[in-house]
């Protein structure tokens, strides 16, 4: 298992990843990412 990191670090990491060529720009609207109060992430694709 892996340990959960701080949500601030994860948010910074996600911000870095968003600029990369992982996803094409027209796919941007297909991904809905959110965090709940406990810091657990969900993605609706």
From Swiss-Prot:
GO terms for biological process: DNA recombination; DNA repair; DNA replication. GO terms for molecular function: DNA binding; zinc ion binding. Keywords: DNA damage, DNA recombination, DNA repair, DNA replication, DNA-binding, Metal-binding, Zinc, Zinc-finger. Binds preferentially to single-stranded DNA and therefore, destabilizes double-stranded DNA. It is involved in DNA replication, repair and recombination. Binds ss-DNA as the replication fork advances and stimulates the replisome processivity and accuracy. Homodimer in the absence of DNA, monomer when binding DNA. It comes from the Viruses. Interacts with the polymerase and the uvsX and uvsY proteins. This is Single-stranded DNA-binding protein.
